Amino acid sequence: RGLGDVYKRQIQKVEVFDTELYKDLIDYDALEAYRKRTLNPHTNPVTRGGAENDDIYFQGMEARNEHYAKVPAIVAEYMEKISEITGRHYAPFTYYGAPDAERIIIAMGSITETAHETIDALMAKGEKVGMIKVHLYRPFAPEYMLKVMPSTVKKIAVLDRTKEPGSIGEPLYLDIV
C-alpha cells in the first residue's frame, strides 16, 4: 500500500482563493487564440503531421527547444505574481531547513510533508539538515535549484517517486547529478 493510497482516504481543510484574484494574470486574447488553433473535431477539424517522416518530425521537435527553454523563467514570474496575490511563497524550488545545512534531501510530492517534520526533529537535536522541494519538474531548471541550496551542503539524498528497474538512477536523481 503506497502513500497515494493512504492520502486518497484523508480529509484535509483547503483554503481556496477566489478566481477573481487571478484574472489579471490571464491574457484572455492569447487564450482565445490558442483555443481556436487547437485540435478539436467539433470546432476546428484539421489533420496535422499525418505525413511527417522522422527527419521532419525531429526538426519540429528541435524548433520547440527555444520556446521550451523559456518556460522556467515564465513559470517563475507567474509564481512570483501569485505569491504577491496570495501572500504565500511560490517558486520553482523552495528550501526548508537550517541555513547552514550540510545534508539535504531533494524531493517532490507528498513525501515533502513527512520530510518537513523529520527536518524539524533533527534540527531540534542540533543537526544541520534541510530539504529542497521541487515544484517545477519539467523542464528541469537547475539554476533555480542552485539559488536556494545552501553553499554549506556536503551530502544530498534524492527521494524519487519512481523506481526504474535496470536504470542507473531514477529521473529526478539523474537530473540532480
For each of these PLM feature ranges, what is it?
Residues 1, 5, 76-177:
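Thiamine diphosphate
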Residues 5-95:
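Conformationally flexible catalytic loops at phosphate/diphosphate-handling active centers
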